[in-house]
């Protein structure tokens, strides 16, 4: 038995290692840990996060399709759920999104633009928009800004089916 909770497992692009968040029983401390996929042996801890009340890892890390030495992850380390960029040495490279709003989820990547597609309530607390952020931190809303949006990406991430509605718009689907 263990006093740890394991969650958000992700494979490395080369499939030789796996990454997971290990939480203490109180769920106030979490560590991103790398393991050898064949032996199950712990290789190293990349970083740790702490919250006095509750640490909630929301999603596994996601490696950049154009650079397998870097990954993104969601964290509330600044008080809001945002996207962070790190490398496989555990170094935090950049906070990609910032502000008094929440990133709901990472939808995928636009490989040619080297950007992340995500959903957030940046425009309004009562909206959910589809947004993009580049590795330089520059971000923008995709498509119609009003309403509640969900998205389906093409394989390349260059095209998006934007499903949305609002109090004045019945369900609509746009190609962006």
Model-derived features: positions:
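Peripheral, non-catalytic segments that deliver or gate enzyme domains
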Residues: 1-176
């Amino acid at each position: 038995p263990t006093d740890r909770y394991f969650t958000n497992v992700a494979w490395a692009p080369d499939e030789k290692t796996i990454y997971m968040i290990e939480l203490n029983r109180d769920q106030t401390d979490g560590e991103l840990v790398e393991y050898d996929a064949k032996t199950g042996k712990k290789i190293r801890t990349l970083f740790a996060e702490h919250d006095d009340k509750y640490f909630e890892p929301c999603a596994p890390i996601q490696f950049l399709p154009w650079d397998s030495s870097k990954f993104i992850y969601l964290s509330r380390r600044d008080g809001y759920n945002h996207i962070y960029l790190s490398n496989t040495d555990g170094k935090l490279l950049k906070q990609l999104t910032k502000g008094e709003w929440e990133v709901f989820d990472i939808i995928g990547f636009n490989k040619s633009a080297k950007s992340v597609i995500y959903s957030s309530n940046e425009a309004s607390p009562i909206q959910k928009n589809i947004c993009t952020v580049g590795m330089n931190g520059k971000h923008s809303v995709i498509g119609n800004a009003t309403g509640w949006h969900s998205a389906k990406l093409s394989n390349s991430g260059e095209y998006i089916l934007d499903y949305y509605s609002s109090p004045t718009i019945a369900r609509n689907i746009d190609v962006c």
